[in-house]
Amino acid sequence: MTDSLVLSLAKDLIARPSVTPIDEGCQKMMAEFLAPLGFEIEPMVFHDTTNLWARRGTTGPVFCFAGHTDVVPSGPAEKWHTPPFEPTIIDGMLYGRGAADMKGSIASMMAAVQRFTTDYPAHQGSIAFLITSDEEGPFINGTPKVIETLEARQEKITWCLVGEPSSTNHVGDVVKNGRRGSLTGDLTIYGIQGHVAYPHLAENPVHLAIPALNELASKQWDQGNEFFPATSFQIANINSGTGASNVIPGEMQVQFNFRYSTELTDSQIKQQVAAILDNHGLRYELKWTLSGQPFLTGSGKLVEATQNAIKAITGQETELSTSGGTSDGRFIAPTGAQVIELGPVNATIHKVNECVRVADLETLSDIYYNMMQQLLVDHD
C-alpha cells in the first residue's frame, strides 16, 4: 500500500536526525516541496541555526505556519522499540523522534498547503512558513532572529498557527490560545564562611535565606484570570557549602522560576522579589533571565476559524487553554499577530518511543486546510 502524502512527508522528516540545532536537510526538503507551489524561499542562517521563511503571495492578510525541524536527543536507543530515527508504523502508530514534536505537524501543514493551493490558486492574501532548527535549544538564533528580520522590513504576520502538540486525548481537543510568561532568577546570597563550632564568627547564608525563600514560596502572587492560572513560583536549584561537614558556607546559590499570567509584568515581579529580599536584610546579587512574556489571543478570526475547523472535521468541541510550557509563539505574538497552537496528541513528546497516530496526521491536515478555506477564500 502506498503511503499518503502526509505520511510520506512525515517519514522523510523523521528519518533525518536533526537534533537541535542541526537541521539535517529538513528545511531544504521543505523548500524543494514548497517552491513548485509558488512559494518564495528565503533561508535565514544565524550562526549554528538554520531558519526558513517561505511565502506565497505578496499581499495581506498573511496566514503563517510556524514550527521547528529540530528535535531533542533520543536518549538511549536500546530503550526504544524501534530505532528512533527510522520511522516505523506499529498498530497504526508512527514511531520516531519528532513524530509528535513536531515533524508530524509540519508534514500535515505541507500536505494541507499543497491541496489548498491546488484548489484555490488565486486565494486571498499570503501563506507563509516560519521554520527554525533552534526551538528545542537556547532559542537565540531561531524564531526571534527571523521575527527581527521581518519587523525590520515591516513584513507582518496576521494569523500564526504554531504546530506544537497541543492535544491531550484526541486531535483538536485542546488548542493553546496563549502561554504564560517565564522569568528565571539566579540569586546569590552572601554570608561569612567559618567553622561550624564557632557560629558567632560566621554568617550562615542558608539560615539567612530560609525565611526569605519561604516568603517567596508562600506568597500569593496573583489570582490569575479567566484565561490564566495564578502565577507560580518554583525553586529549581539550590547549592551551598564546600562538601565538608565542619564548614559554614560563605554563600548560597538559588535558582527559581516564575510562570506568570497577564495579571503581572516581569518588572512588577522583579520589584516585589527585591523588596522581600531587602526586607530580610540579605546581602545578595540577583540576575534575571526573561524567556518570554505572556500572550493571549482572545476572540477573533483565528480562534473562530480554529474552533469551526475542529468542529467540522472531528465533530468535537475544543478547549482553549494557556497551560503548559513556552513555545515560539511568544516571539511572534508581540508583533501584533494572532497566535494559536494546534498539533497532535502530546502524551509521548520528549519520551522514549515517541509516536503519533497516523490517522491523526491526516485529520490535522484536514483541519489546517479548513482553516485556510475560512481565512483565505472569499465566501461572498
Curated annotation (Swiss-Prot):
Keyword Hydrolase: yes
Protein name according to UniProt: Succinyl-diaminopimelate desuccinylase
Segments forming a coiled coil: none
EC number: 3.5.1.18
Binding site for Zn(2+) 1: H68, D101, E164
Annotated pathway: Amino-acid biosynthesis; L-lysine biosynthesis via DAP pathway; LL-2,6-diaminopimelate from (S)-tetrahydrodipicolinate (succinylase route): step 3/3
Binding site for Zn(2+) 2: D101, E136, H350
